[in-house]
Swiss-Prot record:
SUPFAM superfamilies: Thioredoxin-like (SSF52833). It holds the Pfam family 2Fe-2S_thioredx. Belongs to the 2Fe2S Shethna-type ferredoxin family. It comes from the Bacteria. Binds 1 [2Fe-2S] cluster. This is Ferredoxin, 2Fe-2S. Disulfide bonds: none annotated. The keyword Iron applies.
Amino acid sequence: MVNPKHHIFVCTSCRLNGKQQGFCYSKNSVEIVETFMEELDSRDLSSEVMVNNTGCFGICSQGPIVVVYPEGVWYGNVTADDVEEIVESHIENGEVVKRLQI
């Protein structure tokens, strides 16, 4: 996939310096990545949407953080249960999920 229609970044950081407050990794962000991949596959969107885990975005208190490009929309306090709504509303229908947007 050279030019995906959407690119989803999920913070999976487990910052070890003790200064951050959220620790996305400890809030099951790896499960969020897996759920995105499963949801996209079930909707036959895997060839159009790339999902990557990433390091800290610097706003741990609102994590887990998900960022969707090309729109540059940031979502906070995301759980695996929110993934279906993000895929259906944002990816398929172009509508930002306002309740999660930061």
